[in-house]
């Protein structure tokens, strides 16, 4: 069954007893396994087991994110919040960045916003930016910071429009050409321009959103337009 890259599952669990003293963690993992889902816990999710499980009498919703190899429990909420399931879909363009807020329960686009890519401060065309940061890691990090600033502005616009905060969004899929994804990851993109054109990375896949500096609890899936610079 294809569940996408995130899912939310409501679990009505039996609280621990002396006869069944399994941990809160194992109760959740066992219940997920009964649904055909093998998962592991992230540390932030483990830290939310108490007091949420006790206060909700073990009627909880778990948020799961696919990390490329296994489902990870990334959040816990009291009660049934399975319908409140959101994701971002982003187009990271060299001039304009577009982000859509998606209801992952039914695929509905709830809102869309666009912004000029703040990278343009380092050149209106890609080549100027590539040369600006060649062998200059501090400039490369500045360009990456401009990218993140653009996303932050877009997330805030979407929050104002829908009331849904970035911290309530599980994951993001971002597509862009090879250079834009290199900038997003903080990788020097000069290899895109110079022979033999062997890029630093072209199968990035899933990376933890927090490690990238994003507020989402799950992962960011980066998709590169291989045919473009």
Predicted segments, located by residue:
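Secondary-structure junction/capping motif
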Residues: 20-23, 208, 227
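Residue-level detector of conserved catalytic or cofactor/ligand-binding positions
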Residues: 221-229
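Residues forming the flavin
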Residues: 93, 218-220
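Generic signature of intrinsically disordered, low-complexity segments enriched in small/polar residues
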Residues: 125, 196, 200, 228-229
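N-terminal glycine/serine-rich phosphate-binding loop of ATP-dependent small-molecule kinases
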Residues: 1-183, 190-193
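Active-site phosphate-binding/coordination module
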Residues: 190-218
């Amino acid at each position: 069954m294809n569940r996408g890259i995130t899912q939310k599952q409501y679990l009505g669990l039996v609280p621990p007893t002396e006869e069944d003293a399994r941990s809160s963690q194992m109760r959740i993992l066992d219940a997920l396994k009964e649904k055909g889902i093998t998962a592991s816990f992230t540390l932030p999710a483990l830290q939310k087991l108490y007091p949420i499980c006790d206060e909700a009498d073990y009627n909880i919703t778990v948020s799961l994110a696919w990390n490329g190899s296994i489902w990870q429990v990334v959040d816990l909420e009291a009660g049934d919040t399975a319908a409140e399931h959101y994701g971002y879909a982003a187009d990271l363009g060299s001039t304009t960045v577009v982000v859509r807020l998606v209801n992952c329960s039914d695929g509905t686009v709830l809102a869309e916003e666009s912004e000029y890519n703040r990278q343009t401060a380092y050149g209106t065309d890609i080549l100027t930016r590539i040369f600006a940061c060649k062998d200059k890691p501090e400039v490369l990090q500045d360009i990456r910071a401009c990218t993140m600033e653009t996303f932050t502005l877009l997330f805030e616009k979407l929050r104002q429009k829908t009331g849904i905060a970035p911290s309530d969004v599980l994951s993001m899929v971002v597509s862009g050409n090879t250079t834009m994804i290199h900038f997003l990851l903080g990788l020097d993109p000069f290899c895109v321009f110079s022979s033999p054109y062997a890029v630093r990375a072209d199968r990035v896949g899933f990376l933890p959103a927090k490690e990238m500096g994003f507020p989402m609890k799950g992962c960011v899936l980066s998709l590169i337009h291989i045919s473009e610079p």
